[in-house]
Design a protein with these regions (language model features):
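His/Met- and acidic-residue-enriched segments that coordinate or traffic transition-metal cofactors
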Residues: 3-171
Length: 171
């Protein structure tokens, strides 16, 4: 499939480390946060679109639709901030992970999606956004991370609950 990020952002060909042209000068850590957050959103959106096709579990489909809605909003918010800074947030999904999920169907898919995207990816995102909200040097990015953090933490809790109910119903 095509890049997941293409659905909500046309990626620039500029390298990730490009300095803003006349915009705010960002620290390398802030630039890395932009790239990591953008990839996280793109991966979750792409994987969740696969979930809508490959899952047969209505709970997984409901979770996936919520991830698409929320991460699209988060991605647009990040793109608006980075556009003002003239920093390219060229989101590209983790194609290896999304590609692996595309090969699975039914319960195998559901378990892999909930564990790898629902729990593991959201745990990484919580860590990323927590770090940025506490230690970021750019005030706009710190504030954006702080605003997004409760949403991502809620997603992690939803995923853990879903994983628990799936384990309970499959044994």
């Amino acid at each position: 499939m095509a890049s997941a990020g293409a659905a909500y952002a046309q990626a620039s060909d500029a390298p990730a480390s490009a300095a803003p042209a006349g915009g705010t000068s960002l620290s390398p850590a802030d630039q890395q946060f932009i790239q990591d957050a953008s990839q996280s959103d793109a991966t979750e959106i792409a994987a969740s679109k696969v979930a809508l096709k490959n899952s047969r579990d209505p709970r997984v489909k409901k979770f996936a639709q919520q991830m698409i809605t929320d991460h699209t909003k988060l991605a647009r918010s990040m793109a608006a901030i980075t556009a003002k800074m003239r920093v390219p947030a060229a989101p590209a999904a983790d194609s290896a992970l999304v590609g692996k999920l595309q090969t699975l169907k039914g319960q195998q898919f559901d378990e892999a999606y909930v564990e790898q995207i629902g729990v593991e990816a959201h745990q990484r995102a919580v860590d990323l956004f927590q770090q940025q909200s506490q230690s970021g040097t750019d005030s706009q990015l710190k504030a954006a991370a702080a605003r997004a953090l409760p949403i991502i933490q809620h997603h992690l809790e939803m995923a853990k609950q879903l994983a628990g109910t799936m384990k309970g119903s499959s044994s």
